[in-house]
Each structure stands twice: as C-alpha cells, then as structure tokens.
Amino acid sequence: MKFSSLLFTASLVAAMPASIEPRQAQESINKLIKAKGKLYYGTITDPNLLQSQQNNAVIKADFGQVTPENSMKWDATEPQQGKFNFGGGDQVVNFAAQNGLKVRGHALVWHSQLPQWVHNIKDKTQMKNAIENHIKNVAGHFKGKVYAWDVLNEIFDWDGSLRKDSPFTQVLGEEFVGIAFRAARAADPNAKLYINDYSIDDPNAAKLKAGMVAHVKKWVSQGIPIDGIGSQTHLDPGAANGVQAALQQMASTGVKEVAITELDIRSAPAADYATVTKACLNVPKCVGITVWGVSDKDSWRKEKDSLLFNAQYQAKPAYTAVVNALR
C-alpha cells in the first residue's frame, strides 16, 4: 500500500505543470477598483523585473496596468542622437498585451536620466528639433499600444516656477511645454497626455502645487493638449490626508483626468494606503492608481518597506486595507 501510494503521488506530481505560482492575495485590487468605475490599479515593471516569474504572477493576478520603470526614458530610448532603442519598452508592452494590461508610458521629457548630448544643446532651434524628433520616434513607435504618456516629468521647482536646472527650461523657457505636448499629440493622437510631478500632495509644497495649477490652467486655455495630471505620491507615514485635496485641485485645472502615478508609502501603513485609495475613489476625474513596484525587495525605497507585497511576494496588511477600501 505504501509503495502504491508513493507511485500514485509521484504520477500526480509528474502530471502537474512545472511552474504553478501561488495566489499571493485573496482578491485582485484591479478588479475591485474597476467595479468602482475606475480604469486600473497598476504597478511598474521592466525587462529586469520580467525575469521574475513570481513578480509577473502578482502583476497578472492583482494589477491591471503597468508603467515601465526606466525602459522608455530618454537615456534608454535615444542614448545617441537619432539612434533609437526600443527593446526594453517593447518587452514591457508585449507583456502587457499578452496579459490584457494597460500601459502608461514614462517619460518622454525629463531633466533626469537624460543623455549628455541633450544637455550639450544650447541653441533654441536645435533643442526644439531634438524634443520633437525624440517624441515623434518614441511615442510613434508605441502608437496605439500606450494608454497614457507622461509627456513631461518633474518640470516644477518648489517655488512653483519651472525647474531652473532643466536644460529644456534653460534653452527654451516655457516654450518647451507646448512643443512637447503638440509633438506627442501628433505622434499618438489617441493617447492621454500627462504632466507628472512630485510632492503635489505635500502640505509643505503649497507653492509648487499652486504654481502647477496656475500654469496648467493657462496652458490648457492656450490650447496645449494636456489631458491629465499625474501625482507621483511618494509619501511618508501620516502624509496621506492631503492626497484627495491635491487631486481635486489638479482636476480643477481643466484637464480631463488625473491619476496617482508612483505611489509608495514608507513603512506601508495600512491606514495610509486605504486613505490614498479612497481619495481616488472620491475624485471623479481620478482614473486610477499606480504603485511604484510590486515587492519591497525591488523598490527604489527598498529599505523603507513601502509597497503592498513583502520581499517574499506575500500581500501585506496594506494590501488588505486597499481591498477593504475598494469594497
């Protein structure tokens, strides 16, 4: 009997697929947020993260949107002027297409992770041409495959003015905003076009937020095709209470939608994650939430335990709090 039982067990094991992944959470937060009328609850990935079947399993089970963490930024896509590399971005887009996930493209124009050749441009016409050509090629390559683009990323200083250490501001002044958005609209007419920025929800950044609101209202009134504003929402514990008011102020600028785009909260307090989730639910123009990573071990704030899943890909109390907030 013992021998035959062993044979039976062995035959069952042999018949099982080689790569069964456990369900890391009891409910999909993407499914729950869509039931509330929102478009997605998302996360990030990139070619290095796609190597992890555990990471992929969590994304497929629990999320509905992905943002490429680095593979669509300027240094990755056009490291040398006029020479483009879409390999990393293609991997993310293909993974998304295979699994029914929306993609937020990130980021077409950003002063950081920028090749030196762009920093070296001092002539207005050359800078305008560089922006237009970059966006034409990158957004054009992914045309029809990306739900939304962060066209401009982190363009404001703490005083609400345009960032002074940006080569785009230094060479073109405010003109680069219209140049970038019009190029993006031409390259992919159906993608939602965003300004994405930091600390909008920080009570200590009132000038930054006021400056952004005033600038975006002006740009929208000028016909610049800005569809949305993204709030990165990198928070410390206890700082979630300002998120809803920030989203409401962003929504008041005349844009069609707003989103939480890079959410993480140091130490991942469950109550704070619930507060942020409810903030999006309470603002009609908020279309979704993206957390900036799956597992704590892969977070840019990895020592802070800021995400919804721990280093073993197990759902944390913060995940349960999000589920409860969405019920």
Curated annotation (Swiss-Prot):
Pfam families: Glyco_hydro_10. Weakly inhibited by the wheat xylanase inhibiting protein I (XIP-I). Disulfide bonds join C280-C286. Induction: Expression is under the control of transcription factor XYR1 and highly induced by xylan, carboxymethylcellulose (CMC), and hop cell wall. The keyword Disulfide bond applies. GO terms for biological process: xylan catabolic process. Optimum pH is 5.0-7.0. Optimum temperature is 40 degrees Celsius. This is Endo-1,4-beta-xylanase C. The gene is XYLC.
